[in-house]
Protein backbone atom coordinates (compact mmCIF):
# COMPACT_ATOMS: atom_id res chain seq x y z
CA UNK A 1 0.00 0.00 0.00
CA UNK A 2 2.83 2.37 0.84
CA UNK A 3 4.53 1.61 -2.48
CA UNK A 4 1.34 2.32 -4.37
CA UNK A 5 0.87 5.68 -2.69
CA UNK A 6 4.45 6.71 -3.36
CA UNK A 7 4.27 5.84 -7.04
CA UNK A 8 1.00 7.65 -7.51
CA UNK A 9 2.41 10.69 -5.73
CA UNK A 10 5.32 10.89 -8.19
CA UNK A 11 3.00 10.50 -11.11
CA UNK A 12 0.37 12.93 -9.87
CA UNK A 13 1.41 15.47 -7.27
CA UNK A 14 -2.18 16.45 -6.63
CA UNK A 15 -3.02 12.92 -5.59
CA UNK A 16 -0.37 12.80 -2.89
CA UNK A 17 -2.24 15.11 -0.58
CA UNK A 18 -5.33 13.02 -0.91
CA UNK A 19 -3.51 9.77 -0.07
CA UNK A 20 -1.78 11.36 2.88
CA UNK A 21 -5.05 12.64 4.17
CA UNK A 22 -6.57 9.17 3.87
CA UNK A 23 -3.72 7.65 5.81
CA UNK A 24 -3.92 10.14 8.61
CA UNK A 25 -7.64 9.79 8.92
CA UNK A 26 -7.60 6.01 9.13
CA UNK A 27 -4.67 5.89 11.56
CA UNK A 28 -6.67 7.34 14.44
CA UNK A 29 -9.87 5.33 13.98
CA UNK A 30 -9.59 1.54 13.40
CA UNK A 31 -12.59 0.03 11.70
CA UNK A 32 -14.15 -2.89 13.62
CA UNK A 33 -15.66 -4.47 10.57
CA UNK A 34 -12.37 -4.92 8.73
CA UNK A 35 -11.04 -3.24 5.69
CA UNK A 36 -13.58 -1.27 3.69
CA UNK A 37 -13.27 0.55 0.39
CA UNK A 38 -11.46 3.70 1.14
CA UNK A 39 -13.41 6.91 0.56
CA UNK A 40 -10.92 9.71 0.39
CA UNK A 41 -11.98 12.72 2.35
CA UNK A 42 -10.40 16.05 1.35
CA UNK A 43 -9.84 18.49 4.13
CA UNK A 44 -10.09 22.15 2.98
CA UNK A 45 -6.75 23.82 2.94
CA UNK A 46 -6.49 27.45 3.97
CA UNK A 47 -5.81 30.04 1.26
CA UNK A 48 -2.50 31.00 2.84
CA UNK A 49 -1.12 27.46 2.78
CA UNK A 50 -2.49 26.49 -0.65
CA UNK A 51 0.27 25.98 -3.22
CA UNK A 52 -0.67 27.22 -6.70
CA UNK A 53 -1.09 24.55 -9.31
CA UNK A 54 1.63 24.83 -12.01
CA UNK A 55 -1.06 24.83 -14.65
CA UNK A 56 -2.77 27.83 -13.06
CA UNK A 57 -0.05 30.17 -14.36
CA UNK A 58 -0.58 29.74 -18.08
CA UNK A 59 2.33 32.04 -18.92
CA UNK A 60 4.77 29.77 -17.05
CA UNK A 61 3.53 26.68 -18.85
CA UNK A 62 3.99 28.10 -22.38
CA UNK A 63 7.05 26.90 -24.23
CA UNK A 64 7.12 29.83 -26.71
CA UNK A 65 5.94 33.40 -26.13
CA UNK A 66 5.42 34.51 -29.73
CA UNK A 67 4.31 38.07 -28.99
CA UNK A 68 7.58 38.92 -27.21
CA UNK A 69 10.37 39.39 -29.81
CA UNK A 70 12.99 39.45 -27.04
CA UNK A 71 11.83 36.23 -25.35
CA UNK A 72 14.37 33.43 -25.10
CA UNK A 73 14.13 30.05 -23.44
CA UNK A 74 17.77 30.26 -22.45
CA UNK A 75 18.29 31.50 -18.91
CA UNK A 76 21.82 32.70 -19.64
CA UNK A 77 22.03 35.18 -22.60
CA UNK A 78 23.93 34.05 -25.61
CA UNK A 79 27.41 35.41 -26.07
CA UNK A 80 26.33 37.11 -29.31
CA UNK A 81 23.57 38.95 -27.44
CA UNK A 82 26.02 40.14 -24.82
CA UNK A 83 28.37 41.37 -27.54
CA UNK A 84 25.55 43.20 -29.33
CA UNK A 85 24.51 44.93 -26.11
CA UNK A 86 28.09 45.98 -25.48
CA UNK A 87 28.42 47.36 -29.04
CA UNK A 88 25.21 49.36 -28.62
CA UNK A 89 26.36 50.87 -25.32
CA UNK A 90 29.76 51.84 -26.71
CA UNK A 91 28.79 52.69 -30.28
CA UNK A 92 29.76 56.34 -29.97
CA UNK A 93 33.33 55.47 -28.95
CA UNK A 94 33.73 52.37 -31.11
CA UNK A 95 31.23 52.32 -34.01
CA UNK A 96 31.29 48.73 -35.26
CA UNK A 97 28.65 47.94 -37.87
CA UNK A 98 29.93 46.94 -41.30
CA UNK A 99 31.94 43.99 -39.94
CA UNK A 100 28.85 42.32 -38.44
CA UNK A 101 26.44 39.84 -39.97
CA UNK A 102 23.26 41.38 -41.46
CA UNK A 103 20.98 40.03 -38.72
CA UNK A 104 23.31 41.37 -36.03
CA UNK A 105 23.52 44.74 -37.80
CA UNK A 106 19.74 44.97 -37.74
CA UNK A 107 19.62 44.31 -34.00
CA UNK A 108 22.19 47.02 -33.36
CA UNK A 109 20.38 49.54 -35.57
CA UNK A 110 17.05 48.83 -33.89
CA UNK A 111 18.46 49.78 -30.49
CA UNK A 112 20.82 52.64 -31.32
CA UNK A 113 19.89 55.99 -29.82
CA UNK A 114 18.73 58.69 -32.28
CA UNK A 115 20.79 61.17 -30.23
CA UNK A 116 24.16 59.86 -31.37
CA UNK A 117 26.49 62.51 -32.86
CA UNK A 118 26.10 63.02 -36.61
CA UNK A 119 29.86 62.73 -36.98
CA UNK A 120 29.45 59.06 -36.02
CA UNK A 121 26.24 58.14 -37.86
CA UNK A 122 26.08 60.30 -41.01
CA UNK A 123 28.38 58.35 -43.30
CA UNK A 124 28.12 55.02 -41.48
CA UNK A 125 24.38 54.34 -41.18
CA UNK A 126 22.21 54.13 -44.30
CA UNK A 127 19.36 52.21 -42.71
CA UNK A 128 16.11 54.11 -43.35
CA UNK A 129 14.42 52.85 -40.18
CA UNK A 130 17.10 54.45 -38.02
CA UNK A 131 16.70 57.81 -39.75
CA UNK A 132 12.93 57.44 -39.52
CA UNK A 133 13.28 57.28 -35.74
CA UNK A 134 15.59 60.30 -35.81
CA UNK A 135 13.04 62.33 -37.80
CA UNK A 136 10.03 61.32 -35.72
CA UNK A 137 11.85 62.23 -32.52
CA UNK A 138 12.60 65.78 -33.72
CA UNK A 139 9.56 66.74 -35.81
CA UNK A 140 5.97 65.71 -35.15
CA UNK A 141 4.98 66.22 -38.80
CA UNK A 142 7.17 64.60 -41.45
CA UNK A 143 6.40 64.70 -45.18
CA UNK A 144 9.04 62.37 -46.51
CA UNK A 145 7.57 62.62 -50.02
CA UNK A 146 8.90 66.20 -50.18
CA UNK A 147 12.39 64.80 -49.75
CA UNK A 148 12.47 62.12 -52.42
CA UNK A 149 11.03 59.46 -50.10
CA UNK A 150 14.30 59.19 -48.15
CA UNK A 151 14.25 59.63 -44.37
CA UNK A 152 18.00 60.18 -44.25
CA UNK A 153 17.79 62.93 -46.83
CA UNK A 154 14.86 64.47 -44.98
CA UNK A 155 16.75 64.51 -41.69
CA UNK A 156 19.81 66.29 -43.09
CA UNK A 157 17.81 68.75 -45.20
CA UNK A 158 15.57 69.79 -42.33
CA UNK A 159 18.44 69.86 -39.86
CA UNK A 160 20.40 72.18 -42.16
CA UNK A 161 17.34 74.35 -42.78
CA UNK A 162 16.78 74.70 -39.04
CA UNK A 163 20.36 75.90 -38.54
CA UNK A 164 20.00 78.45 -41.35
CA UNK A 165 16.68 79.79 -40.04
CA UNK A 166 18.16 80.48 -36.62
CA UNK A 167 21.58 81.72 -37.71
CA UNK A 168 22.29 85.25 -36.41
CA UNK A 169 25.14 87.03 -38.24
CA UNK A 170 27.78 88.26 -35.83
CA UNK A 171 26.46 86.08 -33.02
CA UNK A 172 26.22 82.50 -34.26
CA UNK A 173 29.50 80.76 -35.01
CA UNK A 174 29.70 80.01 -38.78
CA UNK A 175 31.46 76.74 -37.94
CA UNK A 176 28.08 75.40 -36.81
CA UNK A 177 27.05 75.22 -40.47
CA UNK A 178 30.43 74.71 -42.13
CA UNK A 179 31.24 71.69 -39.94
CA UNK A 180 27.98 70.07 -41.01
CA UNK A 181 28.68 70.31 -44.76
CA UNK A 182 31.11 67.34 -44.99
CA UNK A 183 28.52 65.21 -43.21
CA UNK A 184 25.47 66.13 -45.31
CA UNK A 185 26.86 67.08 -48.73
CA UNK A 186 26.01 63.69 -50.23
CA UNK A 187 22.40 63.72 -49.04
CA UNK A 188 21.10 67.30 -49.34
CA UNK A 189 19.36 67.99 -52.63
CA UNK A 190 16.86 70.64 -51.59
CA UNK A 191 17.23 73.62 -49.27
CA UNK A 192 14.08 75.50 -48.26
CA UNK A 193 14.61 78.43 -45.87
CA UNK A 194 11.65 80.70 -45.11
CA UNK A 195 13.45 82.96 -42.62
CA UNK A 196 16.78 84.79 -42.44
CA UNK A 197 17.55 86.61 -39.22
CA UNK A 198 19.41 89.94 -39.35
CA UNK A 199 22.31 90.80 -37.02
CA UNK A 200 21.43 91.64 -33.45
CA UNK A 201 22.61 95.19 -32.77
CA UNK A 202 21.63 97.34 -29.84
CA UNK A 203 21.64 100.95 -31.07
CA UNK A 204 23.45 103.27 -28.69
CA UNK A 205 21.13 105.97 -27.38
CA UNK A 206 22.52 109.44 -27.92
CA UNK A 207 22.86 111.73 -24.98
CA UNK A 208 22.26 115.46 -25.38
CA UNK A 209 26.01 116.20 -25.42
CA UNK A 210 26.98 113.39 -27.77
CA UNK A 211 25.90 115.08 -31.01
CA UNK A 212 28.43 116.68 -33.32
CA UNK A 213 28.98 120.41 -33.36
CA UNK A 214 26.88 120.76 -36.48
CA UNK A 215 24.04 118.95 -34.78
CA UNK A 216 23.75 116.58 -37.72
CA UNK A 217 22.80 112.98 -37.12
CA UNK A 218 23.70 111.92 -40.66
CA UNK A 219 27.24 111.02 -39.59
CA UNK A 220 25.94 108.07 -37.58
CA UNK A 221 26.78 104.75 -39.18
CA UNK A 222 23.67 102.88 -40.28
CA UNK A 223 23.29 99.44 -38.71
CA UNK A 224 23.96 96.66 -41.17
CA UNK A 225 21.11 94.26 -41.91
CA UNK A 226 22.95 91.83 -44.16
CA UNK A 227 21.94 88.23 -43.64
CA UNK A 228 23.83 84.95 -43.77
CA UNK A 229 25.88 84.74 -46.97
CA UNK A 230 25.15 81.50 -48.80
CA UNK A 231 28.33 81.27 -50.89
CA UNK A 232 30.20 78.73 -48.77
CA UNK A 233 27.06 76.73 -48.12
CA UNK A 234 26.06 76.31 -51.77
CA UNK A 235 29.65 75.56 -52.78
CA UNK A 236 29.80 72.80 -50.18
CA UNK A 237 26.63 71.01 -51.35
CA UNK A 238 27.76 69.08 -54.39
CA UNK A 239 24.31 67.60 -55.16
CA UNK A 240 22.11 70.66 -54.58
CA UNK A 241 19.21 70.75 -57.07
CA UNK A 242 16.63 73.07 -55.51
CA UNK A 243 17.09 76.34 -53.60
CA UNK A 244 13.93 77.90 -52.15
CA UNK A 245 14.52 81.11 -50.18
CA UNK A 246 12.39 83.71 -48.41
CA UNK A 247 14.15 86.69 -46.81
CA UNK A 248 11.66 87.17 -44.03
CA UNK A 249 11.49 87.16 -40.23
CA UNK A 250 8.85 85.24 -38.33
CA UNK A 251 7.54 85.80 -34.83
CA UNK A 252 9.35 89.10 -34.35
CA UNK A 253 6.65 90.29 -31.94
CA UNK A 254 7.24 93.69 -30.35
CA UNK A 255 10.68 93.91 -31.99
CA UNK A 256 9.10 94.58 -35.39
CA UNK A 257 11.01 96.94 -37.67
CA UNK A 258 10.78 97.32 -41.43
CA UNK A 259 14.50 96.81 -41.92
CA UNK A 260 14.12 93.25 -40.63
CA UNK A 261 12.58 92.36 -43.98
CA UNK A 262 15.20 93.89 -46.28
CA UNK A 263 16.91 91.88 -49.00
CA UNK A 264 20.07 93.96 -49.20
CA UNK A 265 22.34 94.48 -52.20
CA UNK A 266 25.09 92.56 -50.45
CA UNK A 267 22.68 89.67 -49.97
CA UNK A 268 21.74 89.91 -53.63
CA UNK A 269 25.30 89.92 -55.00
CA UNK A 270 26.34 87.09 -52.69
CA UNK A 271 23.33 84.99 -53.70
CA UNK A 272 23.89 85.69 -57.40
CA UNK A 273 27.50 84.53 -57.18
CA UNK A 274 26.46 81.40 -55.29
CA UNK A 275 23.82 80.25 -57.78
CA UNK A 276 26.04 81.07 -60.75
CA UNK A 277 28.69 78.69 -59.40
CA UNK A 278 26.16 75.94 -58.62
CA UNK A 279 26.03 73.93 -61.86
CA UNK A 280 23.66 71.32 -60.43
CA UNK A 281 20.85 73.76 -59.57
CA UNK A 282 17.60 72.92 -61.39
CA UNK A 283 15.03 74.91 -59.39
CA UNK A 284 15.56 78.38 -57.92
CA UNK A 285 12.86 80.18 -55.93
CA UNK A 286 13.19 83.61 -54.33
CA UNK A 287 9.75 84.71 -53.15
CA UNK A 288 8.27 87.25 -50.72
CA UNK A 289 11.59 89.04 -50.39
CA UNK A 290 10.89 92.54 -51.80
CA UNK A 291 13.07 91.94 -54.85
CA UNK A 292 12.89 95.00 -57.12
CA UNK A 293 13.99 95.47 -60.74
CA UNK A 294 17.66 96.11 -59.97
CA UNK A 295 18.04 93.09 -57.73
CA UNK A 296 16.05 90.90 -60.10
CA UNK A 297 18.36 91.81 -62.97
CA UNK A 298 21.41 90.98 -60.83
CA UNK A 299 19.95 87.56 -60.06
CA UNK A 300 18.86 86.91 -63.65
CA UNK A 301 22.22 87.99 -65.07
CA UNK A 302 23.92 85.29 -63.01
CA UNK A 303 21.56 82.67 -64.49
CA UNK A 304 22.24 83.42 -68.16
CA UNK A 305 23.44 80.31 -69.99
CA UNK A 306 23.03 78.20 -66.86
CA UNK A 307 23.55 74.57 -67.91
CA UNK A 308 20.69 72.84 -66.06
CA UNK A 309 18.28 75.45 -64.60
CA UNK A 310 14.68 74.47 -65.38
CA UNK A 311 12.47 76.51 -63.04
CA UNK A 312 12.65 80.13 -61.86
CA UNK A 313 10.15 81.46 -59.33
CA UNK A 314 10.32 85.17 -58.44
CA UNK A 315 6.68 85.53 -57.40
CA UNK A 316 5.36 87.90 -54.72
CA UNK A 317 8.06 90.53 -55.16
CA UNK A 318 8.33 94.08 -56.56
CA UNK A 319 9.53 93.28 -60.08
CA UNK A 320 8.43 95.64 -62.84
CA UNK A 321 9.00 95.97 -66.58
CA UNK A 322 12.80 96.18 -66.36
CA UNK A 323 12.93 92.96 -64.41
CA UNK A 324 10.53 91.35 -66.89
CA UNK A 325 12.83 92.34 -69.76
CA UNK A 326 15.67 90.60 -67.95
CA UNK A 327 13.51 87.48 -67.58
CA UNK A 328 12.67 87.64 -71.30
CA UNK A 329 16.36 87.62 -72.14
CA UNK A 330 16.84 84.63 -69.86
CA UNK A 331 14.19 82.64 -71.77
CA UNK A 332 16.38 82.37 -74.84
CA UNK A 333 19.67 82.04 -72.96
CA UNK A 334 18.86 79.04 -70.78
CA UNK A 335 16.94 75.78 -70.65
CA UNK A 336 14.18 77.31 -68.54
CA UNK A 337 10.91 75.37 -68.61
CA UNK A 338 8.92 77.10 -65.85
CA UNK A 339 8.79 80.87 -65.20
CA UNK A 340 6.71 82.30 -62.36
CA UNK A 341 6.39 86.09 -62.01
CA UNK A 342 3.06 86.09 -60.18
CA UNK A 343 2.05 89.01 -57.95
CA UNK A 344 4.62 91.53 -59.15
CA UNK A 345 4.37 94.89 -60.91
CA UNK A 346 4.74 93.82 -64.54
CA UNK A 347 2.81 95.98 -66.99
CA UNK A 348 2.28 96.02 -70.75
CA UNK A 349 5.92 96.78 -71.77
CA UNK A 350 7.21 93.90 -69.66
CA UNK A 351 4.59 91.54 -71.08
CA UNK A 352 5.53 92.60 -74.62
CA UNK A 353 9.16 91.74 -73.92
CA UNK A 354 8.14 88.32 -72.64
CA UNK A 355 5.90 87.80 -75.67
CA UNK A 356 8.73 88.62 -78.07
CA UNK A 357 10.95 86.02 -76.38
CA UNK A 358 8.10 83.50 -76.20
CA UNK A 359 7.48 83.64 -79.94
CA UNK A 360 10.92 82.16 -80.61
CA UNK A 361 11.25 79.97 -77.50
CA UNK A 362 11.32 76.17 -77.70
CA UNK A 363 11.75 75.20 -74.03
CA UNK A 364 9.25 77.04 -71.80
CA UNK A 365 6.16 74.99 -70.93
CA UNK A 366 4.65 77.10 -68.10
CA UNK A 367 4.29 80.90 -67.75
CA UNK A 368 2.60 82.42 -64.71
CA UNK A 369 1.84 86.17 -64.78
CA UNK A 370 -1.16 86.28 -62.48
CA UNK A 371 -1.80 89.32 -60.28
CA UNK A 372 0.12 91.75 -62.47
CA UNK A 373 -1.32 94.49 -64.66
CA UNK A 374 -0.39 93.73 -68.27
CA UNK A 375 -3.84 94.85 -69.55
CA UNK A 376 -5.01 94.24 -73.13
CA UNK A 377 -1.87 95.62 -74.69
CA UNK A 378 0.25 92.99 -72.98
CA UNK A 379 -2.39 90.28 -73.33
CA UNK A 380 -2.66 90.78 -77.09
CA UNK A 381 1.12 90.61 -77.45
CA UNK A 382 1.15 87.27 -75.65
CA UNK A 383 -1.72 86.00 -77.81
CA UNK A 384 0.20 86.87 -80.98
CA UNK A 385 3.23 85.00 -79.63
CA UNK A 386 1.15 81.90 -78.94
CA UNK A 387 0.16 81.68 -82.59
CA UNK A 388 3.72 80.65 -83.42
CA UNK A 389 4.87 79.11 -80.13
CA UNK A 390 4.79 75.31 -80.15
CA UNK A 391 5.90 74.37 -76.63
CA UNK A 392 3.93 76.33 -73.98
CA UNK A 393 1.31 74.16 -72.25
CA UNK A 394 0.24 76.26 -69.23
CA UNK A 395 -0.60 80.00 -69.23
CA UNK A 396 -1.87 81.86 -66.16
CA UNK A 397 -3.08 85.44 -66.76
CA UNK A 398 -5.54 85.75 -63.88
CA UNK A 399 -6.08 89.22 -62.41
CA UNK A 400 -4.41 91.27 -65.17
CA UNK A 401 -7.16 93.72 -66.22
CA UNK A 402 -7.79 91.86 -69.48
CA UNK A 403 -10.98 92.39 -71.48
CA UNK A 404 -12.67 91.55 -74.79
CA UNK A 405 -9.81 92.48 -77.21
CA UNK A 406 -7.52 89.94 -75.55
CA UNK A 407 -10.29 87.33 -75.58
CA UNK A 408 -10.80 87.87 -79.32
CA UNK A 409 -7.16 87.14 -80.11
CA UNK A 410 -7.07 84.19 -77.70
CA UNK A 411 -10.03 82.65 -79.52
CA UNK A 412 -7.92 82.66 -82.68
CA UNK A 413 -5.10 81.02 -80.75
CA UNK A 414 -7.44 78.28 -79.50
CA UNK A 415 -8.43 77.45 -83.06
CA UNK A 416 -4.87 76.79 -84.25
CA UNK A 417 -2.74 76.03 -81.15
CA UNK A 418 -2.21 72.33 -80.43
CA UNK A 419 0.04 72.46 -77.35
CA UNK A 420 -1.83 74.53 -74.74
CA UNK A 421 -3.56 72.34 -72.17
CA UNK A 422 -4.35 74.89 -69.42
CA UNK A 423 -5.34 78.58 -69.55
CA UNK A 424 -6.41 80.74 -66.60
CA UNK A 425 -8.22 84.04 -67.29
CA UNK A 426 -10.01 84.32 -63.95
CA UNK A 427 -10.63 87.69 -62.27
CA UNK A 428 -10.55 89.67 -65.53
CA UNK A 429 -13.18 91.59 -67.52
CA UNK A 430 -13.73 89.26 -70.45
CA UNK A 431 -17.42 90.15 -70.70
CA UNK A 432 -20.33 88.55 -72.55
CA UNK A 433 -18.98 89.11 -76.06
CA UNK A 434 -15.51 87.97 -75.03
CA UNK A 435 -17.01 84.76 -73.67
CA UNK A 436 -18.77 84.09 -76.97
CA UNK A 437 -15.50 84.63 -78.84
CA UNK A 438 -13.73 82.13 -76.60
CA UNK A 439 -16.57 79.63 -77.08
CA UNK A 440 -16.18 79.93 -80.85
CA UNK A 441 -12.46 79.25 -80.56
CA UNK A 442 -13.08 76.22 -78.33
CA UNK A 443 -15.27 74.63 -80.99
CA UNK A 444 -12.14 73.95 -83.06
CA UNK A 445 -9.81 73.07 -80.17
CA UNK A 446 -9.12 69.44 -79.24
CA UNK A 447 -6.19 69.78 -76.81
CA UNK A 448 -7.19 72.28 -74.09
CA UNK A 449 -8.09 70.46 -70.86
CA UNK A 450 -8.46 73.31 -68.33
CA UNK A 451 -9.90 76.79 -68.88
CA UNK A 452 -10.56 78.91 -65.78
CA UNK A 453 -13.02 81.76 -66.44
CA UNK A 454 -14.27 82.39 -62.91
CA UNK A 455 -15.16 85.99 -62.02
CA UNK A 456 -14.55 87.15 -65.59
CA UNK A 457 -18.10 88.35 -66.44
CA UNK A 458 -18.66 85.53 -68.95
CA UNK A 459 -22.25 84.43 -69.51
CA UNK A 460 -23.27 81.23 -67.75
CA UNK A 461 -24.34 79.66 -71.03
CA UNK A 462 -20.95 80.32 -72.64
CA UNK A 463 -19.16 79.04 -69.57
CA UNK A 464 -21.29 75.89 -69.57
CA UNK A 465 -20.69 75.15 -73.26
CA UNK A 466 -16.95 75.74 -72.83
CA UNK A 467 -17.04 73.27 -69.95
CA UNK A 468 -18.71 70.69 -72.19
CA UNK A 469 -15.99 71.13 -74.82
CA UNK A 470 -13.31 70.72 -72.14
CA UNK A 471 -14.98 67.53 -70.91
CA UNK A 472 -14.93 66.11 -74.44
CA UNK A 473 -11.23 66.97 -74.76
CA UNK A 474 -10.41 65.31 -71.43
CA UNK A 475 -12.34 62.19 -72.39
CA UNK A 476 -10.50 62.00 -75.71
CA UNK A 477 -7.17 62.44 -73.90
CA UNK A 478 -8.09 59.64 -71.51
CA UNK A 479 -8.89 57.32 -74.39
CA UNK A 480 -5.59 58.16 -76.06
CA UNK A 481 -3.77 57.33 -72.83
CA UNK A 482 -5.58 53.99 -72.55
CA UNK A 483 -5.08 52.98 -76.20
CA UNK A 484 -1.94 54.69 -77.49
CA UNK A 485 -1.34 52.04 -80.16
CA UNK A 486 -4.83 52.53 -81.62
CA UNK A 487 -4.34 56.29 -81.65
CA UNK A 488 -1.00 56.00 -83.46
CA UNK A 489 -2.48 53.63 -86.04
CA UNK A 490 -5.26 56.14 -86.70
CA UNK A 491 -2.71 58.90 -87.25
CA UNK A 492 -0.76 56.72 -89.65
CA UNK A 493 -3.89 55.84 -91.63
CA UNK A 494 -5.10 59.43 -91.90
CA UNK A 495 -1.67 60.91 -92.58
CA UNK A 496 0.19 63.55 -90.57
CA UNK A 497 -1.80 66.36 -92.14
CA UNK A 498 -4.98 65.12 -90.41
CA UNK A 499 -3.41 64.18 -87.10
CA UNK A 500 -4.35 67.34 -85.20
CA UNK A 501 -6.56 66.48 -82.22
Curated annotation (Swiss-Prot):
SUPFAM superfamilies: RNI-like (SSF52047). GO terms for biological process: flagellated sperm motility. Residues 1-56, 203-222 are annotated as: Disordered. The keyword Cytoplasm applies. Its main location: other. GO terms for cellular component: cytoplasm; cytoskeleton; sperm flagellum. CDD domains: LRR_RI. Residues 24-34 have a biased composition (Low complexity). Keywords: Cell projection, Cilium, Cytoplasm, Cytoskeleton, Flagellum, Leucine-rich repeat, Repeat. InterPro entries: DRC5, Leu-rich_rpt, LRR_dom_sf. The keyword NADP does not apply. Residues 1-23, 35-49 have a biased composition (Polar residues). LRR repeats lie at residues 308-321, 335-355, 363-383, 391-411, 419-439. It comes from the Eukaryota. It is found in: Cell projection, Cilium, Flagellum; Cytoplasm, Cytoskeleton, Flagellum axoneme. It holds the Pfam family LRR_6. Component of the nexin-dynein regulatory complex (N-DRC) a key regulator of ciliary/flagellar motility which maintains the alignment and integrity of the distal axoneme and regulates microtubule sliding in motile axonemes. May play a role in the assembly of N-DRC. May be required for sperm motility. Belongs to the DRC5 family. Component of the nexin-dynein regulatory complex (N-DRC). Interacts with DRC1. Interacts with FBXL13/DRC6, DRC3 and DRC7. This is Dynein regulatory complex subunit 5. The lineage of its organism: Eukaryota, Metazoa, Chordata, Craniata, Vertebrata. The gene is TCTE1.
